[in-house]
Amino acid sequence: MVSVDQVKKAREGKKRRFTQTFELIFNLKNVDLRKYRLSTYIVLPRGRGKKMPILAIVGPENKELAEKYFDIVLTREDLKQLDKRTAKKLAKRHYHVVAQADLMPELGKSLLGRFLGIRGKMPNPKAGQILPPNLNEKMLEALREKLNNTVRVNVKKHVTFGVPIGTEDMEDEAIAENADTVINEIISQLPQGKQNIDSVYLKLTMGPAVRVL
């Protein structure tokens, strides 16, 4: 669906002093977002091209283990002590959030939970973000790798939205494969499939938009 030539064309913009992200821009049509909400998680087969920040909420018995795999680890007591400014900052900074199942009620009632909810980042079982109390290294290593390659799609109000699919450091073939995976998954989630898509563009953060669908 997305060709290597289209990826090359999207690279033609001026070089920047930072590593740009490849993004697909979707424009939907004939979808009433008041009745239908597009919410899904997509694992990119060729990865994101960079490490994504992940926040974990676990019991004190699992904190040391979790710190090996996640960027910030909070316990029940840490949740209680968060002020509004810190909670808001944590919710904004982290792309994924995981939490032990037995701590979900407390997370939901906390300041952090409120800001995560606003951003659509509350731990979701569909993405494997709800943890059992008996954690182990093999489990967390696999989860870290999976989440690092997982993008979140949460469309509530606007028929135009973007999905990150990699960085400019990645090979053209990898970007094309990731793009196909995301487009096919979005189509499968829409009420009328491809008929609900008006257009799809591929672009770098500061680059030209190339129509791919």
UniProtKB/Swiss-Prot annotation:
This is Large ribosomal subunit protein uL1. SUPFAM superfamilies: Ribosomal protein L1 (SSF56808). PANTHER family: 54S RIBOSOMAL PROTEIN L1, MITOCHONDRIAL, LARGE RIBOSOMAL SUBUNIT PROTEIN UL1M. The keyword Transport does not apply. Binds directly to 23S rRNA. Probably involved in E site tRNA release. Part of the 50S ribosomal subunit. Belongs to the universal ribosomal protein uL1 family. InterPro entries: Ribosomal_uL1 (IPR002143), Ribosomal_uL1-like (IPR023674), Ribosomal_uL1/biogenesis (IPR028364), Ribosomal_uL1_3-a/b-sand (IPR016095), Ribosomal_uL1_arc (IPR023669). GO terms for molecular function: rRNA binding; structural constituent of ribosome; tRNA binding. It comes from the Archaea. Keywords: Repressor, Ribonucleoprotein, Ribosomal protein, RNA-binding, rRNA-binding, Translation regulation, tRNA-binding. It comes from Nanoarchaeum equitans (strain Kin4-M). Gene3D superfamilies: 3.30.190.20, 3.40.50.790. Coiled coil: none annotated. The keyword Amino-acid biosynthesis does not apply. GO terms for biological process: regulation of translation; translation. GO terms for cellular component: large ribosomal subunit.
